[in-house]
Amino acid sequence: MSILRTIAMFIYLFGYMILHYGILRRAERAAAAGDTATVEQIVNQHIPRWSRGILKVTGVSLSVEGLENIPKDRPCVFVANHRSYYDIPLLLAGLEKPHGILAKEELEKIPLLNRWMKLLGCVFVQRDDVRASVRALNDATAIVEGGRSFVIFPEGTRYKGEELSLIHI
């Protein structure tokens, strides 16, 4: 990814979150009130829009094949290699609705992003603590058992190599 595309991606990422702060607050109030339908409606509308916007701004095209093979009547666990910053927007734009993601704990410290991620159903994992990693995987399992799909990048970080990196979770 060129430095200009990376800069454009992060400007769009945070610009979108700032411009849609009111919507974030509305979703958080709905979550606090137990109104999961409103939270889901907001997440299902804004996360794909944000993802497609990133791809458009950075000149990335997306073609998805095989959506018909993804069950609509039960949750799935999507497991993928993590090659670039684009992996998340590509997945979130390409799938029919957003899914929770197992994410490194450092992302929980980024203002606004962490709040959207929590609404999305992300689980934050401490990669250097085996017990905490197991708890995070148990939390992700509970989400899937509750009927929501989930995304895991088992390498634990972006990896540029051609072969599969060491699995960290």
Region locations from a protein language model:
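A transmembrane-helix-recognition feature enriched in membrane-embedded lipid enzymes
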Residues: 1-63, 115-119
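Soluble catalytic domains of membrane acyltransferases
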Residues: 57-167
